[in-house]
């Protein structure tokens, strides 16, 4: 009689990678819809550009490596990378920026390390950081949400601006960014940081139109709540685990609350941190990447808490208004160390 010896793992999750990626893509629909509503059709154009670029870049590398193109593209990981990058950049950023960022993310940050499962850093965030450092002006040129905007460009105008820099009527990006108070608007986090450095009081800052929302910044609060809804659905579907999002949000809220209580004249209130920028997108869709996050439950709690602390520190004291991308990459660096010290004890073995 011949006994077959199989290597671990001996228990398996029946869900394939492609299905999990598809669930994440579906969960992103509420967040995408909210961004389309508040910032216009540019987001959809960026998603289409990023998706096509990601698939072509991945196919090219797979062809060069003589690997199966069709089988790998079916895992949907390239599409997810493109999507996450596209929703992270301003909706009217030039077309070549999203193409450049996506190609860099797929080829350099993912395939250069061996493909899905081998990359130590989140590819979408690598692409985002490369663009942010290289083109800071374009990467911070967000439109004001439609609640306070003079006008939001339609689909044709969005395409025109993305590909040529001008609308059909001759308006440019600066014209579109002109807010109701006659000044160029930015995100709530960017506005807060810039205004504090200019010597304005928090009381004055919170009177700006960008903070006319019920809980936080106009438009941005609903965008974050939409991403939160998608994240809760992912938890319900058991596509992600709760450890990273919970520890991230609790740590960010705790740090923001303590900072605000000790320095209310210079630091943003907790609701600004939780419902502005890429907070919920990062908590449920970026930090939960199974490849670049910690693999143990205790490790996931530490990983999420570290990212939350880093986001608050970068937003409060760093040079960039939103620190999610940098926090994710810095936390990715610590994953091997976290996993080493949180690995479970082998059954039957005692600690030495």
Curated annotation (Swiss-Prot):
Pfam family, one: NQR2_RnfD_RnfE
Residues bearing the modification FMN phosphoryl threonine: 187
Transmembrane regions listed in the UniProt entry: 20-40, 42-62, 89-109, 123-143, 214-234, 242-262, 267-287, 301-321, 322-342
UniProt KW keywords: Cell inner membrane, Cell membrane, Electron transport, Flavoprotein, FMN, Membrane, Phosphoprotein, Translocase, Transmembrane, Transmembrane helix, Transport
Assembly behavior: The complex is composed of six subunits: RsxA, RsxB, RsxC, RsxD, RsxE and RsxG.
PANTHER family: ELECTRON TRANSPORT COMPLEX PROTEIN RNFD (PTHR30578), ION-TRANSLOCATING OXIDOREDUCTASE COMPLEX SUBUNIT D (PTHR30578:SF0)
Protein name: Ion-translocating oxidoreductase complex subunit D
